[in-house]
């Protein structure tokens, strides 16, 4: 059976092409508390929230070399929240004037039978993990501090094991394409977190 | 110079000629007397400079005189002198030694002069007394004591002076420090109440309600300044505060939102700026610093501006049948026909006093404080809503937004459901609704009150409930007759006053909806009052043992009433001889007729048919009672008297 054609055209979400601006960093477990404390002071005045999410990464291999990747994510601690399907494009490092990593991004809320639908379409699950951490917000900026847990038995999210002794810190903004001004705000915010965590644009290609 | 006696030197020889030798023959050979110059040279050679003499001046004068004498040979002598120095030829010239000595003396004098001048400055060199031992023992011990005492006293004085100087310095420093410290402590107090941040060398504060959820674009920044224009030496005034705040000029003064309801809408052309009537500035609370009141006032101005901006934005956006008008600082809306709600922003700055406001005094009764207060409540609710509507997405990677909004896709919401998520009532709509309710309530109260005061016979009582909603309140209306409250409880009405209409709930559960027009309520109450009289007769008949023959709330006969319908009742006496018929209309009033037994009517024409005496028990014709001539203070009492008069004596 022939594999369904995979479009390599840039994926856009509706009429507006949304981009995700991203800065990443990490903190060791023991300094998590001071970082949380600092974030509570800097971010919008609201109760800090925790989250437990289960993410599954699906691949669709076509004739092309690079597979098509979709990320399905669901909340484990909030009942009734919709699933979240996300497409992330190739990250662009950009020049020095842009202070954040930029990638194409399409967000869709879906019902819970998403996995079946993706399987039917020919997607195949590549890997899955559980993310557990804290969520902050300042204006349009979203700050997530979380730890990634490996799932020992596939499909069983209760049986997990921490992947590392550190927390991943992500500062992200989803904005329409071309609004590079937001990266300045992000840089300023990252500066204020400086001694605790260094948020940088990390090129995933270099890590591979 | 030492005190050795000087040797007198005479420059003239005692004798004229010196004897060179005395010959054996006794002849004296004289030496040729020395010429003047030779003599001088000889004498000069004999001067011993190392040995001082008492007559220095004299000698110096002589030497000078000599020098003058020798002035003629001066120039050549100088040259000779130089040569002499160079050639090391001593005694080339008779004054050589004198000159050399004078020279060295001059050098020493110069050095001494320099040293003294340096010493006098006391900068680089000081003169220290050589240790006492060096003094010759023959020194007077008393002088020594005196000197040492003087010295130690001087030392002590110096120490004291130094101490005093240090003290004055520290006192001035303290004063300065105190001011500084006061500023810092004030700043600390300010910090406890207001948001501050440092920008460059300035301290800026935040007046805005942004952290509370406000979206008003005014930055609301104030600057903290150090109050330094006070002289330290002068007395510090009571209200002096080392810290001062500078608020933006557009937030100065005092402001408030004024809401009023007028009966008649003025011509739009007449609309102008609403004048302020002056309000005294709020007195600062004792103990609270001066900047606190200043900042609170500025924050109030900011909030009022935000309320007004929000209202005017909504006034323009909302499509209503009668459009809302925004003119200058006034928003005009028409909640009911011929009724005008005006909301205005009054802002007065302290320095600018308008003389107009003093003359044109607004009447305070059309000033709705409740609505003004509610506007403040509403804007705060609005703030809270914007704060709480920001919800964290779950799962965490999802974009920000309302949860129901994201559910709309997967759950396939239709248009109405999506609209219901988004729609929220604006501030203006809410306040107009409240104003409508307030107006309706006051109109209801006025109607009931005027009826109660105008109509005495059935009494009308209103019991207002104390606890109301902003959009609904209720009143219980009782219609009674004086003295018969216990038996006449037929009419009890519950009036629920809403925003647009009044719902009337009868005692038996019937519900009537009245519109906002006051006339409707009045007509309704009038008809209820007229029904009450008939009900009262019915109740009274029960008590008196009379029989109700017929009863009708709405009679279809007789003259047509303009309000409601007339009601009627007919009751018969216990033995059936008499009957009373009452017809009561809201407009026509009451008409009471009594039916007599046939045998009591004298003027009744004899009928051919009714010959038998048994027909005498048939009732005869009705006769109207002249009701206004009856005894009794009210309708029910009169009726009771009538009934008892027609009842047979049971004894």
Curated annotation (Swiss-Prot), chain A:
Compartment(s): Nucleus
The entry's keywords: Activator, Nucleus, Phosphoprotein, Transcription, Transcription regulation
Gene Ontology biological-process entries: positive regulation of transcription initiation by RNA polymerase II
Keyword flag Transferase: no
GO MF annotation list: transcription coregulator activity
Record PTM Phosphoserine, positions in chain: 66
Any one GO cellular component localisation term in the record: mediator complex
Quaternary state and interactors: Component of the Mediator complex, which is composed of MED1, MED4, MED6, MED7, MED8, MED9, MED10, MED11, MED12, MED13, MED13L, MED14, MED15, MED16, MED17, MED18, MED19, MED20, MED21, MED22, MED23, MED24, MED25, MED26, MED27, MED29, MED30, MED31, CCNC, CDK8 and CDC2L6/CDK11. The MED12, MED13, CCNC and CDK8 subunits form a distinct module termed the CDK8 module. Mediator containing the CDK8 module is less active than Mediator lacking this module in supporting transcriptional activation.
Family: Belongs to the Mediator complex subunit 18 family.
Function: Component of the Mediator complex, a coactivator involved in the regulated transcription of nearly all RNA polymerase II-dependent genes. Mediator functions as a bridge to convey information from gene-specific regulatory proteins to the basal RNA polymerase II transcription machinery. Mediator is recruited to promoters by direct interactions with regulatory proteins and serves as a scaffold for the assembly of a functional preinitiation complex with RNA polymerase II and the general transcription factors.
The name this protein goes by in its record: Mediator of RNA polymerase II transcription subunit 18
UniProt organism field: Bos taurus (Bovine)
Gene for this chain: MED18
UniProtKB/Swiss-Prot annotation, chain B:
Gene Ontology cellular-component annotations: core mediator complex; mediator complex
Subcellular location field: Nucleus
UniProt entry keywords in alphabetical sequence: Activator, Nucleus, Transcription, Transcription regulation
Gene Ontology MF term list: nuclear thyroid hormone receptor binding; transcription coactivator activity; transcription coregulator activity
Biased composition (Low complexity): 62-74
Region (Disordered): 51-83
BP GO terms, sorted: positive regulation of transcription initiation by RNA polymerase II; regulation of transcription by RNA polymerase II; somatic stem cell population maintenance
Family: Belongs to the Mediator complex subunit 17 family.
Function: Component of the Mediator complex, a coactivator involved in the regulated transcription of nearly all RNA polymerase II-dependent genes. Mediator functions as a bridge to convey information from gene-specific regulatory proteins to the basal RNA polymerase II transcription machinery. Mediator is recruited to promoters by direct interactions with regulatory proteins and serves as a scaffold for the assembly of a functional preinitiation complex with RNA polymerase II and the general transcription factors.
Subunit annotation: Component of the Mediator complex, which is composed of MED1, MED4, MED6, MED7, MED8, MED9, MED10, MED11, MED12, MED13, MED13L, MED14, MED15, MED16, MED17, MED18, MED19, MED20, MED21, MED22, MED23, MED24, MED25, MED26, MED27, MED29, MED30, MED31, CCNC, CDK8 and CDC2L6/CDK11. The MED12, MED13, CCNC and CDK8 subunits form a distinct module termed the CDK8 module. Mediator containing the CDK8 module is less active than Mediator lacking this module in supporting transcriptional activation.
Protein name: Mediator of RNA polymerase II transcription subunit 17
The organism of origin for this protein: Bos taurus
